[in-house]
Amino acid sequence: MEIPSLNKQQEFTLASVTDLTSPSSSLSSSPVVATFSCVNEVKELRFQESKSSDGFSFDLSSTQLFKLGPLQFTCVSDGSISSAKEKSSFSRGVVIKFRDEKDSKEFCDSFEECKKDDAVKQGSALPNGTVVSANKSKFDDKIEAASAKMYFHYYGQLLHQQNMLQDYVRTGTYHAAVMENRSDFSGRVVVDVGAGSGILSMFAALAGAKHVYAVEASEMAEYARKLIAGNPLLAERITVIKGKIEDIELPEKADVLISEPMGTLLVNERMLETYVIARDRFLSPNGKMFPTVGRIHMAPFADEFLFVEMANKALFWQQQNYYGVDLTPLYVSAHQGYFSQPVVDAFDPRLLVAPSMFHVIDFTMMTEEQFYEIDIPLKFTASVCTRIHGLACWFDVLFDGSTVQRWFTTAPGAPTTHWYQIRCVLSQPIHVMAGQEITGRLHLIAHSAQSYTINLTLSAKMWGPGANQGGILQTSSCKLDLKEPYYRMSQPQVYPTQEPPAQSQDIHIHSDDLEELELLQQNANAQL
């Protein structure tokens, strides 16, 4: 299929072209001509000085165009050919500057038309004209489309970016980790993986980065461009690229990767896989990763209030005469459903009944495939005699800078973050004595909805006389979906203690207060 516009060459005169990979070889003299052409059925974009034979060509099938401003774009290709030596390079990029917005628009229209035709040739056209690409990315292979759409829609909204920015523990720790390790950023090339609003990219630029590539797949990329453009002293060293890490190309290797890829239980949303893919694709040998290491912490807990609260949720389905209908056939399913939800909240660390243990995930060494299944053996020693209601989890990450090593934690008792903590509640608690050994397994299996299925087993080993013979006294298991948590952050936490309760930012209006407010409003309306 031949695009009519390429039956003859299309030429555009540019203000300037700067080669990112080799500034000394840039086409600096004016004018510079960009030409779309089709040579031996291969579509090319060629840059050449009008009075010289020097220039280079990009294969359009592997070329991407990124807008930096109204008159400025970055053109990146993973396969370019120099006219001088006819040798291909792995990746090359140029910054294009147009003379006016009319030329800019016409160039972009021609570029998109060529790319559209190339997609039709590589894929298959549906009846409604939609093109299905034959080159599905690795991200698309493992993540279902509906989940990805909702994920990118969520992070494409300023409301949710503001929620993360206002997590001052998170944002402040990142700022400190970067600024305290300026030597790792100064004069270096940085890639911000999942840049969001671009805040980490600007931190890197403030620390003296030579250039920052802010990669963001959601619509937030447009907001990031706007925010960065509003900080002109930083903007000249930051390029926002809209696309997935798995799909894009960069014109150079990175000295530093920076990202905020952590989800609930550290691994939720499966962004850590993208982080290590960026490491494998773009990070130079001996490059730095911020963060560097993550740890999942775990400890058994006792919380009778939480257990009763969850069990009571299913009591609705024990009604035998609900408007003449017997609901009890669904009671067991409802009970199982409530206990299949991990609980996300901030809890009192005094609920923990054994010293915690942790599982290390080294982002510099972990492979993408190792995130598909994470198996953690558990072993604790009970410090009190109690009923264990489940396993509490939280995480921390290390920024291993050359100057300062800084930890960021979501532990109970530490300043609360928007991640809170997470608890897996057993539908059948187990009884333990002080000093009794608790064993088990936490098994995480990744699924295509960008999350994990959690399989938890806890067992209490025999204690006292005869314990040396081994054996298990009690065992309880549960299966949970990390994608569907129970967000309990605003629920009142009642604990028997003589200490004054901690201050809360949540405001609870009781029903009596509501009735009084309604009466006052009615009286006010009557007086008007």
From Swiss-Prot:
PROSITE patterns: SAM_MT_PRMT (PS51678). S-adenosyl-L-methionine binds at residues 161, 170, 194, 216, 246, 274. GO terms for biological process: peptidyl-arginine methylation, to asymmetrical-dimethyl arginine; regulation of flower development; vegetative to reproductive phase transition of meristem. SUPFAM superfamilies: S-adenosyl-L-methionine-dependent methyltransferases. Residues 144-459 form the SAM-dependent MTase PRMT-type domain. InterPro entries: Arg_MeTrfase (IPR025799), PRMT_dom (IPR055135), SAM-dependent_MTases_sf (IPR029063). Methylates (mono- and asymmetric dimethylation) the guanidino nitrogens of arginyl residues in several proteins involved in DNA packaging, transcription regulation, and mRNA stability. Recruited to promoters upon gene activation, methylates histone H3 and activates transcription via chromatin remodeling. Belongs to the class I-like SAM-binding methyltransferase superfamily. Protein arginine N-methyltransferase family. This is Probable histone-arginine methyltransferase 1.4.
